[in-house]
Amino acid sequence: MNFPIGLQLYSVREDLEKDFEGTLRKVKALGYDAVEFAGLFGHGAEEVRNLCKEIGLIPLSAHVPFVDMMNDPDGVLKVYADIGCKFVVIPYLTEEYRPGQPKFQEVIDGAKLLGKKAKELGMQLCYHNHDFEFVKLNGEYALDILYKEVPADILETEVDTCWVNVGGEDPSAYLRKYTGRAHIVHLKDFAGEKSEHMYALIGIDDDKKEEESNKFEFRPVGYGKQDFP
C-alpha cells in the first residue's frame, strides 16, 4: 500500500515567510505529495487552497496552537476547513498546559470541544506528541490519559516517532497500540541523548545549544538511532 508522503512546513518556515508560493513549488518539486501547515504567513484560505490545487499538493493537515484554537474555535477551524485540510493538529503545549500542571485538564476538555467542532467542519482533530507527555500520572502516561479521556472519533494521534523514543518508549509499539487512530505520523530520526536544550532545535528553547559530542540532534530518516526499514 502506498501512503502519501508530506512535509511539515514548520521545517521551512523561514523560506515560507520570504516566498510562500515559491517555497510550496519547491516542496512539490522535491517529490512531496502533501503538506502540513504551520502558519499561513498572512495568506488567505482561498488563496492557499487554490495554490495547492495548482501546484498539485494535498493540503493534508495543519499544526495550530492550542490557545489560538480555543480563543476562536469556529473562526480558526473554518480557515483550515476552507483550505481543504483533512486534519487539524494540536502541535505543542507550553509549560503551563503540560502534564502535571493544573491546566493540563484544560487541554483534555479543550480537545473534546475542538474535536467536535472540527468534525462538524469535516476535519479530524489530532494531537502531536513530544517527550513531555511521557510522565506518569497515577501510574499512567499522560499521553494515554489524553487519548482515554477524549473519544477516538474526535481525537486521533499524530505519533512523532522521534519524541516517543526520546520519551523512553517504542514508536512502533505506540503505533500498533493506536491502530485505527493513527492516520498521520511524523517520521523523524535523531542521534545523541535526551538533553535540557533539545527544543532549541525546533526554535522554541532560546538557550545555547550544547556542544558536547553526544548532543541531541535530528537526522534524516534512517541515519539516526531509529530502526526504520
State the predicted function of each range.
Residues 1-87, 156:
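N-terminal pre-domain/capping segments
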Residues 118-220:
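Acidic/histidine-rich catalytic cores of soluble enzymes
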